[in-house]
Amino acid sequence: MKKKALALLCAAALTLGLTACGNPGGQSSNAGSPSGTNTVGSSAHTSGQNTDFPTKNINLIIPYSAGGDSDNMFRCLESSMSQFLNGNVIVGEIVSGGNAIPGTQQALDAEADGYSIVIAYPGNICIQPNMGNATYQYSDFQAIANITASPVLFAVQESAPYDDFTGWVEWVKAHPGEFTFCTGSLGGTPHLAMMKMLYALGIQDDVVYVPYSGNSEAYAAVAGGQIGGYAAVASGVVNKEFVKPIANLGTVECPAYPDLETLTDVGVDMSQATDVFCGFACSSNVDKETVNALSDAFAKAMELPEVQENFKNLNYTTNYLNAEDFQAYLDENYEAYAQVIQNLDLTQ
């Protein structure tokens, strides 16, 4: 009964015509490229820099668990940054828990001088402020640089009677109410990505959603046969036993599964796709020259072959955006998530 109530909540609230959360329109050709390649180029470097910055180490708040995507992304860059920061380093500090709100707030509480920055992820920057859970506002932040983009993948039980996205859609339509899916959190990026897809296909009433508390629990439920499928960022699906990915719900190619069907293959416009960005942000009160100096340092590090190799080895797709382009990308994502969250009645 609880499962059906959750499904009806989603069905009653969400409407079609959702704005893209993936590749933003109206940007330069380097911004938000869905090609799956590193987009560092001439537009990556910014002008008006503070050339004296930094004069000491920079503290990076990672508001998610150690070993997670945001932590791993930073580790790919960590050892290469000092050569572009006047010999100083970025020190990562894990402050996890509370839907990433406490750690994100900690970065804001520090002096707005550019020496305290935070991982910028859809959850802490766009989703939590829209849901009304955060102790801060979206406008409290400004973008520094984006580093990676990852699609949301949809996987099902390995023994399922369909092997691709098209087959799954046909099966769901023929068996309304029988398919269950889960994600690691209610209102998280994978959940919202699935709901956009379901409504675009008109099958939102034919499936039942079950929220879990964490990606590992969601995966275990599907691998163990209790739930039909789950949606997660690519790293939560790649190389997992007893499940099979059948769809890429984003615009960015997943290197581990380059031939996965996308929304286009089932007749849905890619404006309904959802990609997961991971970058850096800081207080909106930090001066632009300092922000540009940080953005340029990340751009230079991203050009290094060893850094690119680090990301490749972890199946991350690099997608550098400078401060200006990343800000535009964040703005579009914030508005898109606002609409989805409002339609799902997930605001607190």
Residue map of PLM features:
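N-terminal (or domain-start) structured segment
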Residues: 22-26, 32-140, 178, 186, ...
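Short beta-strand->loop
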Residues: 139-147, 208-210, 236, 241-273
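Short secondary-structure boundary segments
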Residues: 121-122, 158, 233-235, 250, ...
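An extracytoplasmic/periplasmic, membrane-proximal ligand-sensing/linker region
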Residues: 55-57, 200-205, 265, 288-348
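Stable alpha-helical elements in mature extracytoplasmic
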Residues: 69-73, 77, 99-103, 123, ...
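Positively charged n-region of N-terminal signal peptides that target proteins for export
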Residues: 1-5, 9-10
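C-terminal motif of bacterial Sec signal peptides marking the signal peptidase cleavage site
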Residues: 17-20
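Hinge/capping helix and adjacent helix->loop/strand transition within the periplasmic-binding protein
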Residues: 81, 106-115, 130-217, 263, ...
